[in-house]
Every structure is written in structure tokens, then in C-alpha cells.
Amino acid sequence: MTIERIQGTDGIRGIVRLAEDCSGSDPISVFLHEAVLTEEFFELYTYAYCQELLEADFASANDLAVIGWDPRDMSGSFNHSAIRGIRKAGLTAVVVDILPTPAISLYQLHVGAACAFVLTASHNPADQNGIKIFIGHSNLKLFPEDDKRLTQRCLSLNFENLRSAPLIGELRNDHAAARKLFIEFMADPQNHWLNEDSLAGAKIIVDAANGAFSPLIEDLLNYESADYIFTNCDPAQGINVRSGVADLEGVSSISADEIENGLFSGYETLEKMLASGREQKEKLLNNSCQVLGFVFDGDGDRCFLLCYDPFQDCVLVVGGDTQAFFQAKLLQQNYSWNQVPLFVNTVESDLEAGRAVQQIGFETMQCAVGDKWILWQSCFYDWQAKLEYYLNKIAASQFRILQEQVRTRLEQMVQSTKFDALFATKNFMSLEKWVSNNIGDELVNSAYAHVCQQQNNIFAIGSEESGHVITLAKMNSGHVTRPVFIGNGLKCALNSLAAIQVLRTVKNTPEFFEWLKCPFPSGFKKSLPVYYVDKSLLDEGSVLRTELEELLLVNLNWPEMEVEIVKRQEEPEMLLLNVLENGLPAAAVFVRNSGTEDKMALYLRGSKELKVHLESLADKIYPFLLLSFKNKNSPMAQAEQLVLLRLKDGAKQVIDLSFEQFAKISLNRLLHEMSSRQQLIKQEGDTWSITETGRICLTNSERSE
């Protein structure tokens, strides 16, 4: 079998285990046959990418490669191995230790590094880890063509040779400098919109997800006007365990009963939100004070807002679509662009979110899932703004020919769907290098200053419903100020809160909290995950994909509607069907493999009027996915089946659901993903029982065997 690409949406992630505990002889075979990342894999992966940059003449010997991580590697084995890979390749490893992803990528830009490695599995469970890569200068993440080259390089390397290779690159620790830079960056009023006075009287519960923000967040949030309670700041308790954004995805409000007795029992942040809200209930009912929450993910690049509603005694969850809408409204109030500003979101977003921002004056664009595609748009439009500035200043025919060549190459890259971040970055840099060599750095710096002005940069907002909201920021390096676009959970939180405080009514009312929950006429939105899958079964041309496509088309035969199958340039593997009414989008239904977790999902988006149709469709398609796409060789899938069998005849306690043959898997994770994510089982007190969906899956599975 030809292996083209081992990465997912955002780098590579998976369950981690020390090499000595695996049966494979080398890190690649362990990954391919056991689906496990070892510390040796981390060394091989960073070495391979540094070699890629050196051979592409993007880096030279002893150039810098920044590396940092979230706190999940408690032993340090994986972190140290990744550092060794950098040094064996001949680059200088600039270690910044535990910092949020935005701080690491920012420091890479600050020191002019060739790349940055972030060792994290983001919102994934604590038993997993991974590697994100940012390319120097552009700060782009790797695209599919980059991933393919890196995959082939990893497959061709002999780890035994690498094991004995010398450490020829240097090592330095810049943690203090990188930490200081990020604190100063976030304190700069240019980089968030929040006025400290607007926090007066607020209580803010901050959930660091036991992740990368844990050792830093109290120094970042030092506004004296607000009262802070910091939760989940102890990595020893497990990153993302009953904390962070992942379990809040798709949730718009959480009742008091769910927090005290139900699905969210034991979630410290939610418990404190409820307790603090009830303590101040009378005060909250009669003025504009709020009990708020900031919830980050493990590596700190995204955020959800929480707000206690005293009228309903519940906690509202403000996701990415809603935060982006609030931020867009505030931007529109504060700026007049030279062109219509651009709002970018992904296919996961509510269809009505795009329509809502169009109505307030934005041009909209939809891209594939993953903030790397949003970063691409921000980088491309930033480059275009600089190019227009240069063209107004430079008459030389040589420059005009060069810029036309670069533009043509980038257009061809997009049209061919061969997205290549290193190729794009080198092209961006070629123009800047020409200006620097032939005219001088002063013009380059003035172009940076020009595009740092929001009205000159038409990229306004990039948004994912998962809580990535990306807007323009500015980084000062010496006498140069340059634009920066980074997924930054804290910046997102502060900007969203600033927008809400400006746009809101003066006094708390039931209508205010309803507006906070739903500021635009929302559509129908449902995402149904299937865990422990064989992702190859969704490949183009596979029998199951064809069967799934036919099943979708048969069940989307709605009156007076047309259906079109759409192939996204950025993610051709996704099966996407648009439903049109009078030629206009009415619904979108798609199935895609997750690029960050061991799962696939069915996504349904559409107008509220189509809710019954879409729910009926889900009832037919979701069981098919649950039954057909599980990876029969996955220990998690096998354990899941055993749990269903154990519960077939009645409720059981946790002790009755453990299996000696699956001692290495996390039972807590398994039960969590079977219950809160797939709805196959449910918990009542200290017992577990099978749901109707679980029983259907079990019955059909037994029949097929």
C-alpha cells in the first residue's frame, strides 16, 4: 500500500508510548502498525523537517528552529527527543519550554527562525501528543504538499543511522525571553480591544485546561477591575480532563442539573460558574454585572466564552461563530476599509453566520476545516496589500515582471489544488528580498506599517466554530512593526468580551442573555462523531464511500431542492453535498475524517425550516457510519464492542466494564467518548447502561458476524 501522507488537519497526533514498550523495531513501523507515536518518532520527524528546509535552501546550518510544548509530556522524553532531531539536522534548537502555541509561533517570527515546532495534541486526551509546524517568515502551517514531502522523507530515513548521528546543532533556552515577549504582546492595546474599565464588576472564571496557559495565565490577566478565579491550572491533573473546550463543542447552554448531577458533573469551571452566579444572582438581575468564563484548549490557540444567565439559572456557551459575529460588528463600527472587508469561516460553521455578516457589510469566504486554511487567507491578503503598496512606490519593470511571476505561480498552485506552504512562503519572500536589495529595508518596513493599519488590510476575521477567531495583531521587533495573524485563545476571549460590552444593552434582561446566546437568526447545526474508524474507507473510489454517497443522494431527494456534490480544493477527501433552493444554499451535509482525532463525523448544516428533514437524514446516515466505518483492528473499537455486549442485559458499574486484554487503553476516555460523544451508552449515578443507538449498533453488528 502506498502511503502518501501521515499527517492530519494540523500536523500529526496520536497515542504516545515509549519505544521500549512497543513491539516494532523502528518508529515508522510502530506508527504504521500500532498507531502509536514514540519518542523516537518525534526525533525522526523534527530531523526530517529540518533536513527538508536545509535541502530547499530555506535554512542554513545553525539557523534557528524554535521549539516549545504544552505540559502533557511529564517525563520530558518526547520533548528532548524532538530537540535532538533538530540538533542532529544541524539547526540551533531554541527551546521555549511550556508556552501556548501563539506564544511559540510569535517568538519564531520575532527571532527570524526557519521554523517552529509545537509539541501538542491540542484538545485531544492526555494520552496523546503530536507535532505542529509553523514555517518561518510567513507563519503558515504545513499544507498537503508539504505533508507529503515530509511523509516520504520520514519513510525513507533509517532510524538506526539517525540514532547514532552526532548533535551538530547548538542548543539554547529562550523561555524567559519568549514568555516576556508574549506578555508584552498581550499587554499592547493594539493587540486586543478590551478597555480595562469595561471589566468593572465582572467575575471571570478562567479554565486553562491544565494546559499550556497554566503557568502563565495569571500574569497575562492582571486587570485589577475584574475578579478572577483560575481553574484547571495543574497539568498533573491531566490536560483537557473535565476541562477545556472539547467537551463544550456543539453546546449552547448547560443547565444547573447537568452541572450538578448530569453530563458536566465534576467540571470545576462550570461548578464555579454556577456557584458564583447564584451567589450574585440578585446583583446580576438588577444591573449589567456578569459572571463570565474563558475556556481554552490544551495548547491555548482557541477559546469559548461562558456566561451565567441568572434568569434561567444556566451557563451559556458562546462558540466561535457567535464570537466572530460579535467581533465583526465591532470592527465594522470602528473602521472604514478601502475595500469591502473579508470574513472567512469554514464548512463547519452555521450557514446563517455567513449570511449574518454579509448583512452587516462583509464579503464572505468559506474554506475547508482547519485554521491553516484561515491562516493562508490572512497571509495571502496581507501579501496582496503589501504588493499594492509596493506597486504604488516602485516603477522598475524588473519588479513588475517578478511580481507577475509570483502571482501566476500562486494562482497555479491554488488552481491545481497542490497547496504548498513552503513554496508559497519562498515566493512571498522573493519579492520582499528584491525590494530590500534594490531599494532598501526602509520601504519594506513602511509596507509593514501600511498593512498594520486595519483599513489597509481587507482580511478582517477568520473563524472556526471550534473557537479559533483570528484577527490582525502587531508585533514590534526593534524599530519594525509587522502584522501578525495567529490563532490565540486569549486574544479571542478579550476581543469577544470587548465587542459584547460595546454592543450590549445597558442592563441585564432575559432578552440580553438570549441575544448573547443567539445574536443572529441561527440555522440548524448538528455534528455526529464516529470514533475508532478506518479512515481509508472514506477514500475516493472506495466501495463504502460510493455506498455512502448513494445513500445520501437517495435521502436528500427533497421537494423543490437540488443537490450538488462539491469537491473542496483544500480537502478533496471530504464528501460534501450542498442542497440548493432556487439556486441558493439551503443546507450542507458532509462527512469527513478528523485530522486531529481518531474519528470521522457527519455534519448537518441548514436553515431552521429544514430541521425535520436534516434530523430525519441523520437518523438514517449516522447508524450506517457507526456500523460500517469502525476499525475492526483498533483496540478502542474492540473494547467499545465489549462494553456494549456487557451492557446488553442491564446496567453495570465501572468495575464490571474493565477488560484485562485492554489494560493499556484508558477506560475513562472510552466511556466518555461512547457516552457524551456517540450516545451509545449513558451514565445514571454510578452505573452505565446501553442507549437505543447503542443497542441498534450492537444488534446489527451481531447479525453481520
Predicted regions and their residues:
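N-terminal small/polar loop signature for handling phosphorylated ligands or for N-terminal nucleophile
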Residues: 58-128, 219-304, 423
